[in-house]
């Protein structure tokens, strides 16, 4: 038994690295694919188990299997200078401009690695395009990095198109004049080649001088019969060029690091930078002989070719999460802008901290598969910050450092296009699976409310409002409806969408304000969330229909003394004279707490209600500003009107008590007023009336 247990433990140790996520499999075709915690090869029943266990490879952690893989590197010290050296001055406005580019343009020193990898990718793309156009076979097209901590150097070498002596002078000797830019200019009508060229500014190479005491470049053009050359500079405004032997076709850059930048001669540090910025470069990328970019840029693939498990693993990668995406949108378009994107909605419900904290977008921005920003705050509006994913666009206007977006009409257009596409996607999902969408709205609805409140354009507010869901008086409890569906049910000639804010459906249906609306046989939306009222106040209208609170409708529709025209039997209602005398007495008792006391015949089960012009706005103002703490201050701000129901037993009894027991009658008036204020949501803390309630109970018990 002990022997079997030891064998089982040993087997578990061998399995553990393979069960980590995410994994990467080398499929028989040789092309690496992003795969789940165990590869499809490992999970497939027809695969050989021994082969399957060797297929998995992690991209987030170096494993023992990685170390056992044979190293592959083309970097070696074979170059030597031949003959004399010629000195040249930089052609772009002196050393001062070079200092600005090399020392002030970039916010982080580490981006020099990204820039040099991008340049190498461009060189390989140029060679690929040339050979394909000429019908020639493609050689090994690779990018290699090598670190040397002892010498304090980092080297990058590509097998791309290389440069002649003249190109070395023109491309590396002039700020903001790169071969990539010239190549694009020459291929304006060939979109495929143009779209794959990363560097367009010609300043990326000079980022090396942020960290370098000296930069050595060896390059040989892919043109037949080309010689190799060395380019050398310390960034002082002068560079040297000499013929060199032993130079391989392509370009090799050796950076001799400054004393305070030796960190970039560490393999671990460089690996982190490559993983951060250049994980999706199109060509094989090696660091000290080990393959780095084994992930696929699945956002560049055709959506129908990406499988669900690939989305799950890519979501975990970009979101740094362990759950699955609740929704996935793979969006590609070439008009009105070139966009390649994938968006995910996390399955995990956001916490209040996630909702309230001031965070920008969690969408990464790429330009031709090179990371520009890990959190691109300008690509999506702030209310969509719960979205995870990637946006890749060739049309994005970047500044010279390729780190900052240049706010422009194009960026605003991109933001609008993505926002509209996501809204359309959510609307489609709500129709496809209403129950799933209802859960999504329950978890993420606060973000949508924020979008409506913060949007400046009414059109945008109404677009976001299409995502809102509420219960309705016309539907069973728990069933949600949209504003569009409400509008479709409106009777001809109806202009308003009515809503009532309450903590729950029971309170909404027993509200005096809803009671007053039921007689109109009008559908009312029930809004239960704290910020619904503020949201609808900001929205104001939807589809040319005004959004009206039932409380406001009562005030506006009857903003004058209601005529006493009641056909109830005399025994069931106070007379007009009794009502007038009672209202006058109540005005005197309540004093400055009310602006007026008047009669209402819209109530049946409630004795009274308070009406305030724009009650929703007033309620929100009181809640946010925490003003009007006393009754007098509150009344001065709100100017409430108390409307009484002359048919209610409490009002009829009050009329009798005001003559026979004025003390008890005054307590009842105060309580009726407080009850109406509570029903209106205008009392923050009802504990102040506990003493009066106790006194009323004592007086009630004195009669028994």
UniProtKB/Swiss-Prot annotation:
GO cellular component: membrane; mitochondrial inner membrane; mitochondrial intermembrane space; mitochondrial matrix; mitochondrion; nucleoplasm
Residue positions binding ATP: 119, 158, 171, 205, 402
Boundaries of the annotated transit peptide in chain numbering: 1-59
Pfam families associated with the record: HATPase_c_3, HSP90
SMART domains: HATPase_c (SM00387)
Predominant location category: mitochondrion
Subcellular location: Mitochondrion; Mitochondrion inner membrane; Mitochondrion matrix
UniProt-listed GO biological process terms: chaperone-mediated protein folding; negative regulation of cellular respiration; negative regulation of intrinsic apoptotic signaling pathway in response to hydrogen peroxide; negative regulation of reactive oxygen species biosynthetic process; protein folding; translational attenuation
Phosphothreonine modified-residue sites: 174, 494
CDD domains: HATPase_Hsp90-like
Tissue specificity comment: Found in skeletal muscle, liver, heart, brain, kidney, pancreas, lung, placenta and bladder. Expression is highly reduced in bladder cancer and renal cell carcinoma specimens compared to healthy tissues, but it is increased in other type of tumors.
Residues with PTM N6-acetyllysine: 262, 324, 332, 424, 431, 466
InterPro entries: HATPase_C_sf, HSP90_C, Hsp90_fam, Hsp90_N, Ribosomal_Su5_D2-typ_SF
HAMAP family named among the record's database cross-references: HSP90
Family: Belongs to the heat shock protein 90 family.
PANTHER family associated with the record: HEAT SHOCK PROTEIN 90 FAMILY MEMBER
Assembly notes: Binds to the intracellular domain of tumor necrosis factor type 1 receptor. Binds to RB1. Interacts with SRC. Interacts with SDHA.
NCBIfam families to which the protein is assigned, alphabetical: PRK05218.1
Record's function text: Chaperone that expresses an ATPase activity. Involved in maintaining mitochondrial function and polarization, downstream of PINK1 and mitochondrial complex I. Is a negative regulator of mitochondrial respiration able to modulate the balance between oxidative phosphorylation and aerobic glycolysis. The impact of TRAP1 on mitochondrial respiration is probably mediated by modulation of mitochondrial SRC and inhibition of SDHA.
Protein name per its UniProtKB record: Heat shock protein 75 kDa, mitochondrial
Originating organism: Homo sapiens
């Amino acid at each position: 038994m002990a022997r079997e247990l030891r064998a089982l433990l040993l087997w578990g140790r061998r399995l553990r690295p393979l069960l980590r996520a995410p994994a990467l499999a080398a499929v028989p075709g040789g092309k690496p694919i992003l795969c789940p915690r165990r590869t499809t090869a490992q999970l497939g029943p027809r695969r050989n188990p021994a082969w399957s266990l060797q297929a998995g490879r992690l991209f987030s952690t170096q494993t023992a299997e990685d170390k056992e893989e044979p190293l592959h590197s083309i970097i070696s010290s074979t170059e030597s200078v031949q003959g004399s050296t010629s000195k040249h001055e930089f052609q772009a406005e002196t050393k001062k401009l070079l200092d600005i580019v090399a020392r002030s343009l970039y916010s982080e020193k580490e981006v020099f690695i990204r820039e040099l990898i991008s340049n190498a990718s461009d060189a390989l793309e140029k060679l690929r395009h040339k050979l394909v156009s000429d019908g020639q076979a493609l050689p090994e097209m690779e990018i290699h990095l090598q670190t040397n901590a002892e010498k304090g150097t980092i080297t990058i070498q590509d097998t791309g198109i290389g440069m002649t002596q003249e190109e070395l002078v023109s491309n590396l000797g002039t700020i903001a004049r790169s071969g990539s830019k010239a190549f694009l200019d020459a291929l304006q009508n060939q979109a495929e080649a143009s779209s794959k060229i990363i560097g367009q500014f010609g300043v990326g190479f000079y980022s090396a001088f942020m960290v370098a005491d000296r930069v050595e470049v060896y390059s040989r053009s892919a043109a037949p019969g080309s010689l190799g050359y060395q380019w050398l500079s310390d960034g002082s405004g002068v560079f040297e060029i000499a013929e060199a032997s032993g130079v391989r076709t392509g370009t090799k850059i050796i950076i001799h690091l400054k004393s305070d930048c030796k960190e970039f001669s560490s393999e671990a540090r460089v690996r982190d930078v490559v993983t951060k910025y250049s994980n999706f470069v199109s060509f094989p990328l090696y660091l000290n002989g080990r393959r780095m970019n084994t992930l696929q840029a699945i956002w560049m693939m055709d959506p129908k070719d990406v499988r669900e498990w690939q989305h799950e693993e890519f979501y975990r990668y970009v979101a740094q999460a362990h759950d699955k995406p609740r929704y996935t949108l793979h969006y590609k378009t070439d008009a009105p802008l070139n966009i390649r994107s994938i968006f995910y909605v996390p399955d995990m419900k956001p916490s209040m901290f996630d909702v309230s904290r001031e965070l920008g977008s969690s969408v990464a921005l790429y330009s031709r598969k090179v990371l520009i920003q890990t959190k691109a705050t300008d690509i999506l509006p702030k209310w969509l910050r719960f979205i995870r994913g990637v946006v890749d666009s060739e049309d994005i206007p970047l500044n010279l450092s390729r780190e900052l977006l240049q706010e422009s009409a194009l960026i605003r257009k991109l933001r609008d296009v993505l926002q509209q596409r996501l809204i359309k996607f959510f609307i489609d999902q709500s129709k496809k699976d209403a129950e799933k969408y209802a859960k999504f709205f329950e978890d993420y609805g606060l973000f949508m409310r924020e979008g409506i409140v913060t949007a400046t354009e009414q059109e945008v507010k109404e677009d976001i409002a299409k995502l809102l869901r509420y219960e309705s008086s016309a539907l069973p409890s728990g069933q949600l409806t949209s504003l569009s569906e409400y509008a479709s049910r409106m009777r001809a000639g109806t202009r308003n969408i009515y809503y009532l804010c309450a903590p729950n459906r029971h309170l909404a249906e027993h509200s005096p304000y809803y009671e007053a609306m039921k007689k109109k046989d009008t559908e009312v939306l029930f809004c239960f969330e704290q910020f619904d009222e503020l949201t609808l106040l900001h929205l104001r209208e939807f589809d040319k229909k005004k959004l009206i609170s039932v409380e406001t409708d009562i005030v506006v529709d009857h903003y004058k003394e209601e005529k006493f025209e009641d056909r109830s039997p005399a025994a069931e209602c106070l007379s007009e004279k009794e009502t007038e005398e009672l209202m006058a007495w109540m005005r005197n008792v309540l004093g400055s707490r009310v602006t007026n006391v008047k009669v209402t015949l819209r109530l049946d089960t409630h004795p009274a209600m308070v009406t305030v012009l724009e009650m929703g706005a007033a309620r929100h103002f009181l809640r946010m500003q925490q003003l009007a703490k006393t009754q007098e201050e509150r009344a001065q701000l709100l100017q409430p009107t108390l409307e009484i129901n002359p048919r209610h037993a409490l009002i009829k009894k009050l009329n009798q008590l005001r003559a026979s027991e004025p003390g008890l009658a005054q307590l009842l008036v105060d309580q009726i007023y407080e009850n109406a204020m509570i029903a209106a949501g205008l009392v923050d803390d009802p504990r102040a009336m506990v003493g009066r309630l106790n006194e009323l109970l004592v007086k009630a018990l004195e009669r028994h």
